[in-house]
Design a protein with these regions (language model features):
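Short intrinsically disordered terminal tails
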Residues: 1-13, 103-108
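Short, flexible active-site loop motifs that bind/organize anionic cofactors or intermediates
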Residues: 2, 39, 80-81
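Short N-terminal "domain-start" leader segments
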Residues: 7-68
Length: 108
């Protein structure tokens, strides 16, 4: 018996495409992050994060009054290299897509 595949909402399709741009294909769960200091690039394993959050960066000079997606590793927050987004809903969709891709069985 086969079941019909549920239709994917357009917002999720868009968010999956956004998140997929920053996947690092070395192993499941790796995504590009904004480097700190003099690093040229950075990547983190979202599977190891304690939380994935959306953050309203009012005080951030780089993205004033925008929403970003961050991975928390204990007390350290790492901004993922997606966005920034104009509204919270977009950031939540992308955070959901990042988790979906990170824990997907389809990755190498």
């Amino acid at each position: 018996m086969s079941h019909a595949q549920p239709e994917i909402p357009e917002e999720l399709r868009w968010a999956l495409a956004e998140a997929d741009k920053e996947v690092v294909a070395v192993a499941p769960g790796w995504f590009r992050a904004w480097p700190t200091g003099d690093e040229r690039w950075s990547a983190v394993n979202v599977r190891a994060a304690t939380q994935v959050i959306v953050n309203h960066s009012r005080e951030d000079d780089r993205h004033p009054d925008a929403w970003t997606v961050r991975a928390l590793f204990g007390t350290k927050a790492v901004e993922l290299r997606v966005g920034p987004y104009d509204n919270r809903a977009q950031a939540i969709w992308v955070a959901h897509a990042i988790l979906s891709l990170a824990f997907s069985d389809d990755q190498p």
